[in-house]
Amino acid sequence: FADSDMILASDGISSAIREHYKEYFNPSVVQKTNRFTWMGSTRKVEDFTYFFKDSKYGPICAHTYQYEEGMSTWVFEMSDECWQKWQFEEFNEQGSADKLEEIFAEELEGHNLIINRSMWRQFPRIYCNNWHYKNIAILGDAKASAHFSIGSGSKLAMECAISLSDAIVEQGEVSVDKA
């Protein structure tokens, strides 16, 4: 890629480009302690909705939104302490879904949760102090992570690309550094 005018790296939260050039991008990576898992449901959700449960082991939040007609995303989040007390580490995906269906039965209104690689994770907060190196510009979650519940790292990368394009047009065809 040495002969390229510009390389846009938008390879996500686990960016290989950011890792390869970490001495230049100077990322700050902080592993957050809350646990979360993504699931789906046929439960209709009109708007982005938060459901909070004050469970016997601590608060649990369900971040929910429609992603297509008749289908909604359910992102469940809780503290590590709450997760451990519920013993989610002992459940497989279906076991976790079953337990969450029990906890959020009222909110699910009789609908089941749908699993698809619905593993429990902890999310890193990433922020790069430098957003470019030579002719490489880093974008989206590779550059700075947003909260996982919004599920729009690709949208953020596109917005970064639009802003960079606007800066290049404004500055004239110059280096990434000047833009």
Language-model features: locations:
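Core beta-strand elements of the Rossmann-like FAD/NAD(P) dinucleotide-binding domain
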Residues: F1-M6
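Central beta-strand plus flanking loop segment that forms part of the substrate or channel wall
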Residues: S14-Y57, D80
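Glycine-centered loop/turn positions within well-structured domains
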Residues: S15, S72, I162
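Conserved FAD/dinucleotide-binding core of flavoprotein oxidoreductases
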Residues: E46-Y127
